[in-house]
Amino acid sequence: MSNGQSVKAVAKYVRISPHKVRQVLDQIRGRSYQEALMILEFLPYDAGSPIWQVVHSVAANAKNNYNLDKKKLVISEIFADEGPKLKRIRPRAQGRAYKILKPTCHITVVVKSIS
């Protein structure tokens, strides 16, 4: 794998706010694959679980599709984009209804191999 080539994995429509996910992503950006998994495993945030799955998936993609060593992988890019919002209604007094927006996000992880 040359320095320009990268391996990517995306988790789409994850049912958590992109703002909450970005707080966790900032802690693992630029770290090695193994270090990122260790950090994610012990974080007290709900966003850690779906991010852990995507990081694990991108390493599996690198090993199976490009025959790379997982120990040499470094997270070069990681970001969360906003997905569609699920719209729900909360009944209120006197026949009114309030709108509830339940956010989703798309988590993208790109890794590169260091030599």
UniProtKB/Swiss-Prot annotation:
**According to its UniProt record, where is this protein mainly located?**
plastid
Q: Does the keyword Ribonucleoprotein apply?
A: yes
Q: For this chain's UniProt record, which GO biological process terms are given?
A: translation
**Regions crossing the membrane:** none
Kindly list the GO molecular function terms attached to this UniProt entry: rRNA binding; structural constituent of ribosome
Which keywords appear in this protein's UniProt record, sorted alphabetically? Answer: Chloroplast, Plastid, Ribonucleoprotein, Ribosomal protein, RNA-binding, rRNA-binding
Q: Where in the cell is it found?
A: Plastid, Chloroplast
Similarity annotation? Belongs to the universal ribosomal protein uL22 family.
Task: Please report the name of this protein according to its UniProt entry.
Answer: Large ribosomal subunit protein uL22c
